[in-house]
Regions:
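Mature, solvent-exposed C-terminal subdomains and processed small-chain segments of exported/organellar
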Residues: 1-191
Length: 191
């Protein structure tokens, strides 16, 4: 093998993820290179399960749809923790997570306590969610997943996204919509 090929293969970054043990907590703290920088950032990740579980993945996306407004409202609007304050569903090799991302001038330890308070609030929020509100969120997500690409560029981005994430699941939007429509799915994941 030519030397140039060896150099390229040595520099290739491999995607990896680590399935954490149940109820485990890990913190990776890194010092900011500039001591005058007042901003900090926190990524708080809650591992949900295996990315291959399509029904659970659809449930996670529905959770993310429902949680989007309350998370933003609490962290960004009410507590004003920072300009970037969001929660979203994400997948990586072998697992999927619900992740909070907050950039703030506040101490990351304090921000973490506020994220945990939002998680407690979300539990109550979802338990008290009226059937009509739940149905609006479910229908909105189904419509989003069934939406046809508006142009060739958008369709291409969807295909390249399936290639780029290395799952090669070109029909995952359709499967998510079908899963959300199924009543047995709703009975299993939400009752």
């Amino acid at each position: 093998m030519p030397l140039c090929c060896l150099r390229v293969s040595c520099r290739t970054v491999r995607f990896r993820s680590k399935q954490l043990m149940l109820a485990s907590q890990y913190v990776w703290a890194k010092e900011v290179p500039n001591p005058l920088e007042v901003n900090s950032g926190i990524t708080y990740s809650c591992q949900i399960g295996d990315h291959a579980d399509r029904s659970l993945r659809a449930a996670l996306q529905l959770f993310a749809q429902i949680a989007q407004e309350p998370v933003f409202d609490q962290l960004r609007t009410k507590e004003q923790l920072g300009y970037i304050a969001q929660g979203y569903a994400t997948a990586s090799v072998g697992l999927m997570s619900y992740r909070f991302l907050v950039q703030s001038e506040r101490d990351p330890v304090y921000v973490e306590t506020r994220i945990e308070a939002v998680l407690d609030y979300l539990k109550t929020f979802i338990e008290e969610l009226k059937d009509e509100e739940f149905e609006k969120h479910r229908q909105a997500l189904i419509a989003k997943k069934e939406e046809k690409p508006k142009n060739l560029g958008e369709e291409g981005r969807r295909f390249w996204g399936a290639i780029g994430d290395r799952f090669y699941e070109f029909g995952k939007r359709k499967f998510c919509a079908c899963s959300l429509t199924s009543s047995s799915y709703l009975d299993y994941h939400w009752k």
